[in-house]
Design a protein with these regions (language model features):
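Conserved active-site tyrosine of GNAT-family acetyltransferases
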Residues: 16-21, 92, 119
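Conserved beta-strand-loop-alpha-helix junction that forms the acyl-donor binding cleft
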Residues: 10-13
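Conserved catalytic-loop position in the HRD/HxD motif
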Residues: 84
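Vicinal oxygen chelate
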Residues: 1-5, 27-81, 89-115, 126-130
Length: 130
């Protein structure tokens, strides 16, 4: 058994696709509709057959409330890892990302936080090498 998918709820799937493929530089993996429902996932270009991130519309009131509560409490909806936070920070900033926290040293890592334009905060983490 393995983990293959996680979900981020978004207020606009097209806007989310633009952000996650443009600003974050991920790749679209799946995009198909079934009636009013759209299944949309992105993956890291470094691991195109690995973990998928579903960009799900927050049309369910519980999903919307959860998304808003996380954002209001400055909690990330998702966390991504990198080997070079400073380079990724500069690249995303150049592509228009709005960071709420620049790269910051914490106990075992460096982290940065940005808005995904769709109602979420995203944390990008570089683990420190000991």
């Amino acid at each position: 058994m393995k983990i293959k998918l996680t979900t981020v709820y978004v207020d606009d799937q097209e806007k989310a696709l633009h952000f996650y493929t443009g600003t974050m530089a991920f790749q679209k993996k799946a995009d198909f509709s079934n009636g009013p429902f759209r299944w949309l996932t992105v993956v890291s270009p470094e691991d195109p057959n690995g973990m998928e991130l579903q960009l799900a519309l927050n049309s369910n009131p519980a999903a919307k409330a959860w998304q808003q509560a996380l954002f209001q409490q400055s909690q990330p909806a998702a966390m991504f890892f990198t080997d070079n936070l400073q380079a990724d920070y500069e690249g995303m900033k150049a592509r228009g990302a709005e960071f709420t926290m620049p790269p910051t040293d914490v106990t075992a890592s460096k982290i940065a936080m940005l808005k995904d334009t769709c109602g979420n905060l995203i944390q990008v983490t570089e683990l420190k090498r000991w």
